[in-house]
Amino acid sequence: MKQGEIEGQKTAMNPDIFASVNLKHLKKMNKKGKMDQYMIYTHNKLELMVKKGNPKGIKKAEDLGRDDLVQSHPNPKTEGIFKFYGSEMLKDMGIYSKVTGDKICKSCWAVEGKTWFTSRHHRETPQRIEDGQADVGIVWKTEVVHAKKEGRGVDGVAIAAPLNKQDNVGYAIGTLKEGRNQANAHTFLQYLQSDGAQDIDASYGCRNASKAEV
């Protein structure tokens, strides 16, 4: 099946909604006239993923500056969690160059034998930690919650605010003017505003959006 075709028939590929963890993306689309309604519907925050039982005794984000840790982090090229937030956290602590070697790459050793940059951190970091290839990794809190629900051999270490970027990380969503299912798109956004949807997000580790945001 070719992209844009089903059984040889052309299909419209214009989506009805667009979502991003970077609100600037939606503001840009609004400015270009492609989107007229958008909102932040939930929040996330950074957390450290460690091996179950935390054998390295990692207690805080500043411990990423320790010399005895092997780290696994999202790459700064294609993974927004690090490109926009994780790297900023390391810079706030003054350890960005030490942890990353100032490298911009993926599926690579940023610092040989010390810091690995993933291609898909949500899959690779838990596995590397379980396999003993890494001691710690920057992830979303929701990823720690999900991994533990799945019985993975990992734990989470909370990162104190404001380093965890909880006031900056908002999942935004909006309806696109060229979408063919406008009514359904607006109904879906209304659902995301409901207490039921907010409770579901919270059960996975998200922080509810404020009434002003939704």
Outline where the language-model segments fall.
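Acyl-donor-binding surface of acyltransferase catalytic domains
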Residues: 34
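Exported/periplasmic ABC-transporter solute-binding proteins
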Residues: 1-4, 9-14, 22-23, 27-31, ...
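Phosphate-/polyanion-interacting regions in eukaryotic proteins
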Residues: 19
